[in-house]
Design a protein with these regions (language model features):
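Hydrophobic h-region of N-terminal signal peptides that target proteins for export
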Residues: 6-16, 483-487
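Ser/Thr-rich, Pro/Gly/Ala-heavy low-complexity intrinsically disordered linkers and tails
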Residues: 1, 15, 408-482, 494
Length: 501
């Protein structure tokens, strides 16, 4: 009887281990031999990665596999390979270290992380990711039975993501590139200084697209440029839909003959600060039922609800420029304050184009003007909004001042051998003046906020251009002048949704 009881308890016994690593070889071995519940700890130092590190063992909800630095940002992974870390199994967490792309050719450093297929519930937390074309790439993979496996429920939280110079590549440049997958949350991050010096000259801070659902962007600080360099390229802040998806890569059909009519559904953008972009701060491309709530956009060309399947609501946003319905897009416009001059922001806040919205002047006109909408309970600083009527924008000024230089618990700059830095200006000519409205930043005009352009060799392919925004930001321009394989033995209940073939 005792023997039977012991055998019955065996599945509940944890085989998790604490594994400390000090070299790249030890790290590779620890990842390759990981067990559910393992905590892999990186000793301080530099780890040079010359081929992909693969994470193929499945963690569980109760026993995720954790990879973290012993000292926050004391460990730096230097990547000289196309993909530094590939995650194809669920329940992995990565915390407290830095990664830097060091490839001599920018097109050879695509991703710090590629999360694919059955890699649901992956967490990136308190990381500093520098100098990759797309620091995070998420995409579906063929399941082998005519369907596709998709990673769901990812979380990117309190990370700093940036480039030290424009990326000299024709490949997509999007700091967080999330294709397919439901219920992704991008929260409390600092995304800054991203630019593309090649191809279509279009870059994004982040987008979610390719048929995903219920994505959330909240309390992020996005600075398309933190320095004073001129922008002749096209930089877009946050997006549902990006530049669109070739139909063979879009849920639910994954069929070249079926258009990707909805790039994202039921997405939410709330309490974000987006500043200093040459194009729109928020771009919605075939994004059905999207909520844009209490964001502050300074020195951008506003918000676009674009194309016939884009619907939604915009409530309580504070911004330079306008919120537009374009090409049959529709939305309800409620208690937004638009057309605010950069000079008015500068009179109210310490350094708004640098993301510092510490109050230095009067903000009285913006306080108490919004009837609280559904879907929001706090502000950018994670403070509960309790007043009967709220301040417009990301900050609830009735609660007093709060620090906005970086998001709550977000990236801290410096440390780990990596320092924050400007993305620089894109050389090689202008492509038109920043004239607002339909004017053209390079690659723009009324042309393509594409986020795409060809395919990369990691299996995460991007479409050709879908003709997105590209309307340059007058406010930002004037401000410059004035100021893979997871072994599919069984499918647990939390595995990715499989689409029909």
């Amino acid at each position: 009887m005792k023997r039977l009881l012991l055998l019955a308890l065996l599945p509940a016994i944890s085989l998790a281990r604490d594994v400390r690593v000090t070299t790249e070889a030890e790290l590779r071995a620890a990842l390759g031999g990981a067990l559910p519940g393992d905590v892999i700890t990186l000793a301080s130092g530099t780890y040079v990665i010359t081929s992909k590190l693969s994470c193929t063992t499945a963690g569980t909800p109760g026993q995720p596999i954790v990879v973290r630095a012993e000292v926050p940002f004391g460990a730096t992974l230097e990547s000289n390979t196309l993909i530094a870390i590939g995650v194809s199994a669920p329940f992995w967490r990565f915390e407290d270290f830095a990664m830097r792309g060091v490839c001599p050719v920018d097109s050879d450093c695509e991703h710090a992380f590629q999360v694919t297929g059955l890699a649901t519930d992956v967490v990136l937390r308190r990381l500093r990711l520098v100098d990759f074309n797309a620091q995070l790439k998420v995409n579906a993979t063929p399941a082998g039975d005519g369907g596709y496996d998709m990673p769901h429920r990812g979380l990117v939280e309190a990370c700093e993501v940036f480039d030290t110079r424009p990326r000299a590549t024709a490949n997509p440049v999007t700091k967080l590139n999330i294709d397919t997958g439901d219920d992704f949350v991008v929260r409390d991050n600092f995304l800054h200084d991203f630019a593309k010096n090649g191809g279509n000259f279009i870059s994004y801070g982040s987008f979610m697209k390719s048929g995903g659902q219920r994505g959330v962007y909240e309390r992020n600080l996005v600075l398309c440029r933190s320095g004073g360099q001129a922008m002749t390229d096209t930089r877009i802040g946050l997006s549902f839909g990006g530049g669109g998806t070739a139909p063979q890569f879009c849920y639910p059909g994954f069929n070249a003959a079926v258009p990707c009519s909805v790039e994202h559904a039921d997405g939410v953008l709330r309490n974000n600060i987006v500043a200093n972009c040459s194009d729109v701060g928020v771009y919605l491309n075939r994004a059905r039922n999207t909520s844009v709530l209490h964001n502050t956009l300074v020195g951008t060309n506003g918000v676009d609800f674009r194309f016939g399947t884009t619907t939604g609501r915009a409530v309580g946003n504070l911004l330079t420029s306008a919120i537009r319905a374009r090409d049959l897009g529709t939305f309800t416009d409620t208690q937004n304050v638009t057309g605010v001059a950069v000079a008015a922001f500068a009179a109210a806040y310490a350094s708004p184009l640098a993301g510092d919205l510490s109050v230095t002047g009067s903000v009285t006109a913006w306080v108490g003007v919004v009837t609280p909408p559904s879907g929001v309970t706090d502000d950018y600083c994670a403070r509960t909004r309790a007043a009967a009527r709220w301040t417009v924008g990301a900050l609830e000024h009735s609660l007093g001042n709060c620090a906005t230089g970086k998001p709550p618990d977000g990236g801290t700059g410096g440390g780990g051998g990596l320092t924050g830095g400007g993305g620089g200006s894109v050389s090689g000519g202008g492509g038109g003046s920043a004239t607002g409205g339909g004017g053209s930043a390079r690659g723009g005009g009324s042309g393509s906020a594409a986020g795409g352009g060809g395919s990369v060799s990691d299996g995460g392919m991007e479409p050709g251009a879908v003709s997105g925004c590209g309307c340059a930001s007058l406010e930002s321009g004037l401000a410059v002048l004035a100021l893979a394989l997871f072994r599919r033995v069984s499918r647990p209940a939390w595995a990715g949704r499989k689409a029909p073939g």
